[in-house]
Amino acid sequence: MRTKQVPVLWACFLLWSLYIASSQTVYPGITARITQRALDYGLQVGMKVLEQLAKEIVIPDLNGSESLKFLKIDYVKYNFSNIKINAFSFPNTSLAFVPGVGIRALSNHGTANISTNWSVKAPLFRDSGAANLFLSGIYFTGIVAFTRNDFGYPALELQDCHVQVSHARVSFFGSLSALYNSFAEPMEKPILKNLNEMVQLCPIAISQVEQFNVNISALEVLTKIDNYTVLDCSLISPPEITENHLDFNLKGAFYPLESLVDPPFTPAPFHLPESRDSMLYIGISEYFFKSASFAHYVSGALGTTLSTREISNYFSQNVQGFGSVLSKIAEIYVLSQPFILQMMATGPPMVNLQRNNFSLEFPAAVIMLTQLDNSTIQPIVSMDFVASTSVGLAILGQKLICSLSLNRFRLSLPENSQRDAKVVRFENILSSILHFGVLPLANTKLQQGFPLPNPYNISFINSDIEVLEGYLLVSSDLAYDTSSKPQPNLNSWGDLNLVHRPWREQPTH
């Protein structure tokens, strides 16, 4: 009887494990989507970059020996040196998504014009000169597969790579060029054979893919945002690839700088719309902003202490006519005694993303204190308040521009405190400080903008931001600066302030 129960127990355990695993699904904080339009533009730019690189490629000498039976010569040693690609064309080239795998590159009917120096040596003669080699019917295919490694980095692998040159035509130049050109056609077959054996495009491509993996792994997935927080942008799953797009699902979570502990909430699922009008779509979930709010709160970043002089001097320099109002605050409360204003968050700012509405609600406490003649600090009044603001967003050039507007301001006294005339006046003054002082100054700072990253000199153009239910949607086209020299590494990310520390395993929820 006990033996029969064992399979049943194992089955129950398996079902329970599957249930637990399904309930721990991790959703992204950020999803970046690349569309077919981006591939088409990337192909267009890539061909221009290849034209620049082709002129700098060092091609090894091509040499060998062949028997020329039509001339009754047993063997001729030949050497082609100083080989340079002058021009090439790949009119039938395409990039397409391969669902569940990656991106396929396909090119056929390509041509290339190559100049070279040549020399031949036979038992009865030797000669040298210049020549042009025209290649046609160039065929290339390969798939770049996208995966994710154990540390949250994207990883690439080149699969099914094949290169074939179908035709080669040689034109010789020199004193005996007419003679050589008369029997160039029989020489083209062995040249084509050796050329196909020596074409190293696939190994070169594999080497570049491997170098990309090395470079991307050298970057830290944690980026230091400020003195309080870091941002984790590691991949949480392999890239998702359909016939129409490629999605990168990123962690998109903020952490306190000194403690990589997940916040006490998890991201909710969201889905990007099936639109193909832009090259790039980025979905930034509510979780991204909530984790930023939580990380700054637990790091102690959301608090400040200001003296009468600091407040008056600061606002008199930045807000016309406002400093004179603040200079009278001491008279209102404590006559000629200076005061100290302490403001601190009592919880993480609450983030709410609804369609066409991005709002932040700041719960905080404000304490006004005065310093007596004997240096004793005496509290005047203590209040809790909640300020609700709306957030406006726009992308201008290469910067993300933000602005805040105050929706409502609510003060509340502790239950055992009395609400007298001084408190009412303090409410009015504090509300005025927020309306006419804090928010305008914050907006002045915010409107300087946050620079958007442009790796490999890729910029955002025709950008738009839309607030949807539970996430922000950024749509943009891309532009590549073709005037800059292509870089073989990721130096364009070098200005990011990266945290150099070992990465931990992906958290589970």
Curated annotation (Swiss-Prot):
GO cellular component: extracellular space
InterPro entries: Bactericidal_perm-incr_a/b_dom, BPI/LBP, BPI/LBP/Plunc, Lipid-bd_serum_glycop_C, Lipid-bd_serum_glycop_CS, Lipid-bd_serum_glycop_N
Main location group: secreted
Coiled coil: none
Glycosylation site list: 63, 79, 92, 113, 117, 215, 227, 357, 374, 457
Entry GO MF terms: lipid binding
Cited Gene3D superfamilies: Bactericidal permeability-increasing protein, domain 1, Bactericidal permeability-increasing protein, domain 2
Gene Ontology biological process: innate immune response
Signal peptide: 1-23
Protein family according to the UniProt entry: Belongs to the BPI/LBP/Plunc superfamily. BPI/LBP family.
PANTHER family per the UniProt record, alphabetical: BACTERICIDAL PERMEABILITY-INCREASING BPI PROTEIN-RELATED (PTHR10504), BPI FOLD-CONTAINING FAMILY C PROTEIN (PTHR10504:SF17)
The protein, known as: BPI fold-containing family C protein
Natural source organism: Mus musculus
Underlying gene: Bpifc
